[in-house]
Amino acid sequence: MADAEDSRHSKNEGFPNTSLITEKLDLLDLFGSPKVKTEREGRPARLLEGLSAVNAETAFVKTHPLQHEWTLWFLKPPTQGLEWSDLLKEIISFKTVEEFWGIFKTISKASMLPAKSDYSYFLKGIRPEWEDPQNMNGGKWAYQSKHKGSNLDELWLYMVLAAIGETLDPTGKEVTGVVCNMRKGFYRIAVWTRNCNDKDVLEKIGLRFKEVLGISDKETIEYSAHEDSSKAGSMRAKTRMSL
């Protein structure tokens, strides 16, 4: 389970492995993050310029392993006669930088997904469901915005890179995955955690989450526990923290 609305449906200092990808590829500052929203403008161009220069057939001579293996998941829009678990599809797992880019450049952009569908990147072995043993005691930080006129695809890429580069969590133990929910009229990007009670750690993850997305102080992200979301059903789960 991943979405209550569907009724079932700073710098890197102090963070482990913060330069995992940038040190090894030395292509561009993938994890550089603005402090305010207005600073986003230059980032997509720099990022996409770097991406266009990366050709998996010619640029990579050797592979660069990630610290952990990750899995891409896709949640299909609701279909009559199918349970939620039947709509959730495990797409592919990867454990190197090169494998990730090959996958990311091949699949559809998040902005092109139909309403009520999701992309998720989770540590291998963890399903993007509230009921998964690694998620059931946790929760999520979520940022929600209207889809029209946004730079969703770039923001989602920043979030995925921060997740697989393991720069979101100062402990290296809390983050289980990241999710992009496409909904009618808006999208939501979220980072999931194993536990929901360590406020100090959660606050650090939340601040890093805002930094990666370049969210200004005028915008708010909210943290909710999966337990509360499961009880809320179609209603919105109560917010435990906000930044």
From Swiss-Prot:
SUPFAM superfamilies: eIF4e-like
Quaternary assembly: eIF4F is a multi-subunit complex, the composition of which varies with external and internal environmental conditions. It is composed of at least eIF4A, eIF4E and eIF4G. eIF4E is also known to interact with other partners.
Gene Ontology cellular component terms for the protein in this record: cytosol; eukaryotic translation initiation factor 4F complex
Keywords: Initiation factor, Protein biosynthesis, RNA-binding, Translation regulation
Function: Recognizes and binds the 7-methylguanosine-containing mRNA cap during an early step in the initiation of protein synthesis and facilitates ribosome binding by inducing the unwinding of the mRNAs secondary structures.
One Pfam family named in its UniProt record: IF4E
Record's protein name: Eukaryotic translation initiation factor 4E-2
Top-level taxonomic group: Eukaryota
PANTHER family: EUKARYOTIC TRANSLATION INITIATION FACTOR 4E RELATED, EUKARYOTIC TRANSLATION INITIATION FACTOR 4E1-RELATED
InterPro entries: TIF_eIF4e-like, TIF_eIF_4E, TIF_eIF_4E_CS
Family: Belongs to the eukaryotic initiation factor 4E family.
GO molecular function, one term: RNA 7-methylguanosine cap binding
One GO term of the biological process aspect: cytoplasmic translational initiation
Gene name in the database record: tif452
Source organism of the structure: Schizosaccharomyces pombe (strain 972 / ATCC 24843)
